[in-house]
């Protein structure tokens, strides 16, 4: 059964919109490199609710299973992405779940 991997981000104040675009363009391209990643969506919060924590963006990745998330975590392309872009965010939340209706 598919698993959704959500990443909610609060970027550092000094990160520009151009840098954020670069961040997301590079991250979305990981789906072409890491077989475990089946689909990726990202976006910016469009409401003004719950802004006190400063989170502004979200990424949603689809994996085939919990086990394939582990393949993604240790994949050299994912590790390399983190090495380059870790300094962009002030904090993030990660949540993995199995969708239900």
Curated annotation (Swiss-Prot):
Example GO CC term: the record gives:
cytoplasm
Q: Which InterPro entries match?
A: Dabb, Dimeric_a/b-barrel, HS1/DABB1-like
Residue sites binding Mg(2+) per the record: 31, 34, 37
Question: Altering residue 72 to F: what's the impact?
Answer: Total loss of activity
Task: Return one GO MF term.
Answer: metal ion binding
Q: What is the effect of changing residue 59 to M?
A: Slightly reduced activity
List residues binding 3,5,7-trioxododecanoyl-CoA: 5, 72
Record's PROSITE patterns? Answer: S_R_A_B_BARREL
Q: What is the effect of changing residue 57 to A?
A: Total loss of activity
Please verify whether the record's keywords include Cytoplasm: yes
What are the Stress-response A/B barrel domain coordinates in residue numbering? Answer: 3-97
Q: What happens on changing residue 78 to A/N/Q/S?
A: Total loss of activity
Q: Where in the cell is it found?
A: Cytoplasm
Enzymatic reactions: 3,5,7-trioxododecanoyl-CoA = olivetolate + CoA + H(+)
Instruction: Provide the free-text tissue specificity comment from this protein's UniProt record.
Output: Expressed in glandular trichomes and at lower levels in female flowers.
Q: Look up keyword Magnesium and say if it applies.
A: yes
Mutagenesis or variant effect for residue 24 to L:
Reduced activity
Q: How does it assemble?
A: Homodimer.
Task of the protein:
Involved in the biosynthesis of cannabinoids-related terpenophenolic natural products, which have pharmacological activity. Polyketide cyclase which functions in concert with OLS/TKS to form olivetolic acid. Has no intrinsic polyketide synthase activity and requires the presence of OLS to produce olivetolic acid.
Q: What is this protein called?
A: Olivetolic acid cyclase
Q: Which organism is it from?
A: Cannabis sativa
What gene does the UniProt entry assign to this protein? OAC
């Amino acid at each position: 059964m598919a698993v959704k991997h959500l990443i909610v981000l609060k970027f550092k104040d000094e990160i520009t919109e151009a840098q954020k675009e670069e961040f997301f363009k590079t991250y979305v391209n990981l789906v072409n490199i890491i077989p475990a990643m089946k689909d990726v969506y990202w976006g910016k919060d469009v409401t003004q609710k719950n802004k006190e924590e400063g989170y502004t963006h979200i990424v949603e990745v689809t994996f085939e299973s919990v086990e394939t998330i582990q393949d993604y975590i240790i994949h050299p392309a994912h590790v390399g992405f983190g090495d380059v872009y870790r300094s962009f965010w002030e904090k993030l939340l990660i949540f993995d779940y199995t969708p239900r209706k």
